Every structure is written in C-alpha cells, then in structure tokens.
Amino acid sequence: GRQPRVEILDAKTREKLCFLDKVEPQATIAEIKNLFTKTHPQWYPARQSLRLDPKGKSLKDEDVLQKLPVGTTATLYFRDLGAQISWVTVFLTEYAGPLFIYLLFYFRVPFIYGRKYDFTSSRHTVVHLACICHSFHYIKRLLETLFVHRFSHGTMPLRNIFKNCTYYWGFAAWMAYYINHPLYTPPTYGAQQVKLALAIFVICQLGNFSIHMALRDLRPAGSKTRKIPYPTRNPFTWLFLLVSCPNYTYEVGSWIGFAIMTQCLPVALFSLVGFTQMTIWAKGKHRSYLKEFRDYPPLRMPIIPFLL
Amino acid sequence: MAAAAAIAASKGNGGGGGRAGAGEASSSRRKKGPGPLTTAYLVIYNVVMTAGWLVIAVGLVRAYLAKGSYHSLYYSIEKPLKFFQTGALLEILHCAIGIVPSSVVLTSIQVMSRVFLIWAVTHSVKEVQSEDSVLLFVIAWTITEIIRYSFYTFSLLNHLPYLIKWARYTLFIVLYPMGVSGELLTIYAALPFVRQAGLYSISLPNKYNFSFDYYAFLILIMISYIPLFPQLYFHMIHQRRKILSHTEEHKKFE
C-alpha cells in the first residue's frame, strides 16, 4: 500500500531531523509529534511547532495528515518553541504570590516597617476590609484556575512565568506596603466612599465569576471548540450584549472599586496597567471573533460598552 | 546609557543600506521603502537635526574660544541642546506610525533617557550645570548625533559616503564610554542637592497613600547602567564587525 512518509526538517537550517517511515494516513499532528519525540526526547510535544512552510503558521494537534496538502512524502518544518510550562502552573504561581505577599504586609511582619510596628494591627476598618477583598480576589482566581477555566492551550513558554510573577508579585508588594503602612491615610469621604467602593468591588467580582462560568459552559470538557458567547439567565452575563470580553470589563471594575476603597495611588496605577493589557487582549479576542463568525453581533465592543 | 542607546538601538529615521540596529542584520534586500512625501519629510527632519547639533557644536567651540576655558560651557548651548534633544521625541512617533522601521520600545528608551538627563537632572538641579561632567556627555552626544543624523540623511538619499558609515560604527568606541561617564558623574553630582531639597519626592502620610524618593530613584538609574551599558556596547562592536567587513567584501568585487 501507499503509506505516507513524513520527513521533518529544521525550519531555520533545513537540516533533516527525522524521517518517519510508515505513518498512518489518519495520523494526527499530535501523533506525529509523539513519534518525533521518540527520536529527539529533549523536544517534548508541547515545545514542537510543526508547519508546512518554514515561515507559515503552526499546524494544530488535531489536524489529520491525510487532509493536509502534502504528497506521499510530507515535509514538515520544525521550530523549537523553547521550554514550556503549563498554564495551570503559571496561574497558580502568579496568584498564590500576591495572596501570600499581601498578608506579610497586613500582619506587619518584621523588617518591613519600623520595629515598633512589628505584628501590630491597623486601627482603620478599611485596612482590614481591603485585606479581605484582596485575599478574596486571589483565592477566587486560584479556585477558578483549578475548577472553572478550560484552557485552549496546555502550555506557554517558560520565561513567561518570570515575567508574569514579577508583575503580579511586584505590584502586590507595592500596594500592600502603602495600604498596611502605619502612616496610611483613610479615604477622604470616609465610610460613604468605602461602602460605595465595596459595592462596586463585590458586584464586579460576582460579574467576573458569572462570565467565567458562562464561558466554561460554552465549551464541553476536553474540547477546544469555540462558540459565540451569549447572555444567559444570570443578569451579570447580560453585559455580553454590549462587550465581547465582559470578564475583563468586570475585572477592571473590581480594581477601580479597590482603588476607590483604599484611595491608594499604586492601586490606581495597577488598575491602569491592567486595563491597558486587558484592552489589548480584548481587542485581539474581538478581532478573532469577527474573523471566525460571520454572524457576530455588531453592537458589541471589545471591553467598554460603546467606547472601546 | 543615553549615549550608548542612541547609537546602538536606533536603526530608524529612514534610509536603506547598511543600517545597524539592535537585532537587525545588515541587509542589501530591497525593502518596500516609504513613499516620496514621507521620504521628503524624513530627509527634512534629519537635515534639521543635523543642523541643530552642528549649531550646538559650533556654540561650544565659540564659547570655549571666548571664555578661554572649557568650564561652564553648558550655559552657552543650553537652549539649542534642550530644543533639539527634546525634538528627538518625534522619532518615537515615527516608529509608532511606521514610517521608520525601528522598534517603538527601543527608540522610546533611548530618547527618554536623553530627555531625562537633560530635564530631570541637568535642568532641574541647577548646581550641576557648572560641572565638567556635563561637558563630557554634551560633547559625546553632539558628535554622535551629527554623525547619526547625517547617516540617516544620506541613507534616505541613497548616497551614503563610506566615511559617514565608518564614523558611525567606529567613533562610538570612544564616544560611548565618554558619554556614559559624563552622564553617571552628572547624576552622582546631583545627588546631594536632590537629597537636600527633597526634589521630586513625596513622603507619607498623604491622602494618596504614595511615596517617591527621587534620590533612591537616581541611584537605581545609576545601577541600571551596569547591566545595560556592556550589552549595548558589545552589540555595537558586533554590528561594526558585521557591517564594516560586509562593505569591505563588496568593495573587493567592484
């Protein structure tokens, strides 16, 4: 019979890396990656990018060999994506850090503030409230990572964990330092301001969680299908009528709430940076929705209703 | 760093042959260049900048001859220095709108570091304006920029004299360390005055629950030179080898 053969070349040097002799026509790229790993064990499947053209797009794991535009000998080009780490690991590390770090400042662990303040407690209610909110936020994120989110990619490059952790941990330490400082100044408009901010925070946390659940239900376990998200019976999801990524909208809202609650400039700066990044992601997601779905609702904006 | 970054990272302001920049291989590929109107604008921009830095150079020489010493020459070229160095902010815009193929991030770092030194250090801390270290970096920047902007001008017009290319990729060997020394010494000289005046600093308690110590910030800036400067310097050395030997080979076949 005419069983396809696969040769794998290095995308940059065109060096022949591997020749696979009798490959099943129904074989998927994932299976080919596994075969390739056997001859080159240092390149586990997650770090392989195989493509038909050295400069082209990566083939997907689900693609079937027979359905690709190749002859009896398929030539695939290989690029090493570098050491990979699972998304779950990255998320857990990024989020556990701020949770723990904030508490170090809250409990005024030694060497942060002056010695006379070690293990003392703030006399401002808002400081205790802020600790609860901040901790709740990151515990929620950890639980969502473990039980709610369905990731479409298994891994990301290893260097991302250093970059991401520096960002999250760094900002957490910076804001926690001021909020829990002995010289902290409570909000100008007192309890009114704190109550309003807390309401915003809670509503946005609920909203964000609702969106995460709605997105989860959109995609069956183990699959990588993509569908247009629509509002459900949960009123928090009605924001889908106006934006593509309401989870980001609610996330920004939560941090604005927290900034108003603590009246702390570093929190406001963190919100601004986060908003910038999430806007970039939302615009990208919005663009890919538009490209993939002809019937995508035209009223929707990426992240801010009617505006952005 | 401002001096170093300006030479190493900037590959832009138009032009074709033999440009070197951070990470860009020198290529003789015909790239789809900017349109005629854009090219005209960029040529004008680069000519004006070349002229501006020449004005600063001439100003320095005249002031030296008039005073008879090289101390406190800053005051004679303060205004054109501020104007033309700040004008370089336009280069960030050029990258952002795509008329120049350099990285926005890299260009931003290089221009902002120069602008920082001019305004946030030299202008803000009047006491350092009479320091000799200021002259050190001003001379380094002036020579570098005259060569750099004329390099871009000629590249845009597709008539790059080898001398300019040689100068750009050789003089940095001395100008870099000179500029960096001038910059570091100036920042160092500014420190006690910053501390004394509490310049640009805010302390707790305040209603924004924020603090900033400009003195500590300047020290961090100085420390950042340690990892950054060698990288930029050796990148330029590497580029020099690649670009100047490449040209030599071409000349052989003429």
UniProtKB/Swiss-Prot annotation, chain B:
List of glycosylated residues: N209
Annotated pathway: Lipid metabolism; fatty acid biosynthesis
Keywords of this entry: Acetylation, Endoplasmic reticulum, Fatty acid biosynthesis, Fatty acid metabolism, Glycoprotein, Lipid biosynthesis, Lipid metabolism, Lyase, Membrane, Transmembrane, Transmembrane helix
Biological process, per Gene Ontology: fatty acid elongation; sphingolipid biosynthetic process; very long-chain fatty acid biosynthetic process
Topology relative to the membrane: Multi-pass membrane protein
Sequence segments annotated as region (Disordered): 1-33
EC number: 4.2.1.134
Localization in the cell: Endoplasmic reticulum membrane
Domain of life: Eukaryota
UniProt feature coiled coil, ranges: none
InterPro entries (UniProt xref): Tyr_Pase-like_PTPLA (IPR007482)
Residues where N-acetylalanine is found: A2
Residue intervals passing through the bilayer: 42-60, 80-97, 108-125, 131-146, 170-187, 218-235
Bias (Low complexity): 1-11
UniProt topological domain (Lumenal) ranges: 61-79, 126-130, 188-217
Catalytic reaction(s) noted: a very-long-chain (3R)-3-hydroxyacyl-CoA = a very-long-chain (2E)-enoyl-CoA + H2O; (3R)-hydroxyhexadecanoyl-CoA = (2E)-hexadecenoyl-CoA + H2O; (3R)-hydroxyoctadecanoyl-CoA = (2E)-octadecenoyl-CoA + H2O; (3R)-hydroxyeicosanoyl-CoA = (2E)-eicosenoyl-CoA + H2O
One Gene Ontology MF term: very-long-chain (3R)-3-hydroxyacyl-CoA dehydratase activity
Residue ranges, compositional bias (Gly residues): 12-21
Active site: Y176, E183
Segments for region (May be involved in interaction with TECR): 198-214
Keyword hit for Hydrolase: no
PANTHER family to which the protein is assigned, alphabetical: VERY-LONG-CHAIN (3R)-3-HYDROXYACYL-COA DEHYDRATASE, VERY-LONG-CHAIN (3R)-3-HYDROXYACYL-COA DEHYDRATASE 2
Role noted for this protein: Catalyzes the third of the very long-chain fatty acids (VLCFA) elongation four-step cycle (condensation, reduction, dehydration, and reduction). This endoplasmic reticulum-elongation process is characterized by the addition of two carbons to the lipid chain through each cycle. This enzyme catalyzes the dehydration of the 3-hydroxyacyl-CoA intermediate into trans-2,3-enoyl-CoA, within each cycle of elongation. Therefore, it participates in the production of various VLCFAs involved in multiple biological processes as precursors of membrane lipids and lipid mediators.
Subunit (UniProt): May interact with enzymes of the ELO family (including ELOVL1); with those enzymes that mediate condensation, the first of the four steps of the reaction cycle responsible for fatty acids elongation, may be part of a larger fatty acids elongase complex. Interacts with BCAP31. Interacts with TECR.
Family note: Belongs to the very long-chain fatty acids dehydratase HACD family.
The protein, known as: Very-long-chain (3R)-3-hydroxyacyl-CoA dehydratase 2
Source organism per UniProt: Bos taurus
Gene name of the record: HACD2
